[in-house]
């Protein structure tokens, strides 16, 4: 191999390495931040929502993104889908652990996997689910007591979130299963509690109508092109205010 060929070979190897590292970095940067100390939901704070886009370079979409979430579900970006044929669930029981992330409560699943959904022909694996109180999305200006996000990811790293809204009313059987575990970590930021085997199919999706739009993560880095599917029917529960406020 002559000197020119060697130089070309080295250049190609280095280029391939840099490209691979860049792709790996991109694949890890889109995930939502779990450390609540890096940002705040208080608008009057230096690290509040209005400043998220300036806190870190990789969070710039929080300030400049044009497809940000949450939004009001009456927004023109949203369409009402009247059947669930485009959303097929293939969930299965899986070991799970609850974590108090400060800004929300998260249920993360074990490495064995908790199944997936199919959205428009593409499979998205369920990574975790978490709750926000009060709700982040609104419906005709109305904010609800609780909002569940079921976060999914496809093979290319794209995200899809299935959302269920809750109001005060009859107890919800799925939340009821978690009440004791939730209460144990309510006042302990970053605390974790093993839950045992959880079946995501137990989460009630009692409607064949849902809202669909393309948005973003609702926490930094505010990654866009997230497929949001918000169940139209609002669920109920009577105890969650104790655990999520």
From Swiss-Prot:
PROSITE patterns in the cross-refs: ALPHA_CA_1 (PS00162), ALPHA_CA_2 (PS51144)
Residues annotated as glycosylated: 95, 120, 156
Reported tissue expression: Expressed in stems and roots.
Alpha-carbonic anhydrase domain span: 37-245
Entry's induction text: Accumulates in low CO(2) conditions.
Subcellular localization(s) per the UniProt record: Plastid, Chloroplast stroma
Cofactor(s) of this protein: Zn(2+)
Pfam families: Carb_anhydrase (PF00194)
Catalytic residues of the enzyme: 103 (proton acceptor)
Disulfide bridge partners, by residue number: 62-222
Keyword Glycoprotein tagged: yes
Amino acids binding substrate: 218-219
Catalysis performed (reactions): hydrogencarbonate + H(+) = CO2 + H2O
GO BP term, example: response to carbon dioxide
Cleavable signal peptide: 1-23
EC number(s) on file: 4.2.1.1
GO molecular function list: carbonate dehydratase activity; hydro-lyase activity; zinc ion binding
Similarity remark: Belongs to the alpha-class carbonic anhydrase family.
Protein name: Alpha carbonic anhydrase 2
Organism this protein belongs to: Arabidopsis thaliana
Gene (UniProt): ACA2
């Amino acid at each position: 191999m002559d000197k020119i060929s060697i130089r070309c070979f080295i250049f190609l190897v280095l280029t391939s390495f840099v490209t691979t590292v860049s792709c790996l970095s991109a694949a890890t940067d889109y995930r939502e931040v779990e450390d609540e100390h890096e940002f705040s939901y208080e608008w009057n704070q230096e690290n509040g929502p209005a400043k998220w886009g300036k806190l870190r370079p990789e969070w710039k979409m929080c300030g400049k993104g044009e497809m940000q979430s949450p939004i009001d579900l009456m927004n023109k970006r949203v369409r009402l889908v009247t059947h669930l044929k485009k959303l097929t669930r293939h969930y299965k029981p899986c070991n799970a652990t609850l974590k108090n992330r400060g800004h929300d409560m998260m249920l993360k699943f074990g490495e064995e996997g908790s199944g997936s959904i199919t959205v428009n022909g593409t499979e998205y694996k369920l990574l975790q689910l978490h709750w926000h109180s009060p709700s982040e999305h609104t419906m005709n200006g109305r904010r609800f007591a609780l909002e569940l996000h079921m976060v999914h990811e496809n093979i290319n790293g794209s995200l899809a979130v299935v959302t269920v809204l809750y109001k005060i009313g009859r107890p919800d059987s799925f939340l009821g299963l978690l009440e004791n575990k939730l209460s144990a970590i309510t006042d302990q930021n970053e605390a974790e509690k093993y839950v045992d085997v959880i079946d995501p199919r137990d989460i009630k999706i009692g409607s064949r109508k849902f809202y669909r739009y393309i948005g973003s993560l609702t926490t930094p880095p505010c990654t866009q092109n997230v497929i949001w599917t918000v169940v139209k029917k609002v669920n109920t529960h009577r105890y969650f205010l104790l655990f999520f406020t």
